[in-house]
Amino acid sequence: MSGGSTGERPFSDIITSVRYWVIHSITIPALFVAGWLFVSTGLAYDVFGTPRPNEYFTQDRQQVPLVNDRFNAKQELEDLTKGI
C-alpha cells in the first residue's frame, strides 16, 4: 500500500517558513506574559477559588483542617468551617 497525500503542507515546510516564526515569535512570549500576569496579580486565586498563601490559617484557626473520622466527616467539616 502506498501512502496517499492528504493535501496538507508537510510539517517541515511549516516550521522552516518565515511566516511561522513571525507569528510564533509574537504569540509564544505573549502567552507567557499573560500567564505570568494571571498568576502574579492574584487573579488565578480568584478564578479558581483557592485561598491566597496568607489565608490558609487565620488567627482563630491555627490547626491543620484534617478529617480524622470518615464516619463522622460531615460533623468534623461543619466544626472546621464554622468560623469561615
Curated annotation (Swiss-Prot):
SUPFAM superfamilies: Cytochrome b559 subunits
Gene Ontology MF: a single term: heme binding
Biological-process GO terms, alphabetical: photosynthetic electron transport chain
Membrane topology reported for the UniProt record: Single-pass membrane protein
Highest taxon in the source lineage: Eukaryota
UniProt key word Membrane: yes
Transmembrane regions: 22-36
PROSITE patterns listed in its UniProt record: CYTOCHROME_B559
A single GO cellular-component term on record: chloroplast thylakoid membrane
UniProt cofactor note: With its partner (PsbF) binds heme. PSII binds additional chlorophylls, carotenoids and specific lipids.
Binding-site residues for heme, renumbered to this chain: 24
Cofactor entry: heme b
Keywords: Chloroplast, Electron transport, Heme, Iron, Membrane, Metal-binding, Photosynthesis, Photosystem II, Plastid, Thylakoid, Transmembrane, Transmembrane helix, Transport
Any matching Pfam family: Cytochrom_B559a
Gene3D superfamilies to which the protein is assigned, alphabetical: Photosystem II cytochrome b559, alpha subunit
Subcellular location: Plastid, Chloroplast thylakoid membrane
InterPro entries: PSII_cyt_b559_asu, PSII_cyt_b559_asu_sf, PSII_cyt_b559_CS, PSII_cyt_b559_N, PSII_cytb559_asu_lum
Subunit organization: Heterodimer of an alpha subunit and a beta subunit. PSII is composed of 1 copy each of membrane proteins PsbA, PsbB, PsbC, PsbD, PsbE, PsbF, PsbH, PsbI, PsbJ, PsbK, PsbL, PsbM, PsbT, PsbX, PsbY, PsbZ, Psb30/Ycf12, at least 3 peripheral proteins of the oxygen-evolving complex and a large number of cofactors. It forms dimeric complexes.
Purpose of the protein: This b-type cytochrome is tightly associated with the reaction center of photosystem II (PSII). PSII is a light-driven water:plastoquinone oxidoreductase that uses light energy to abstract electrons from H(2)O, generating O(2) and a proton gradient subsequently used for ATP formation. It consists of a core antenna complex that captures photons, and an electron transfer chain that converts photonic excitation into a charge separation.
Family: Belongs to the PsbE/PsbF family.
Protein name: Cytochrome b559 subunit alpha
Primary gene name: psbE
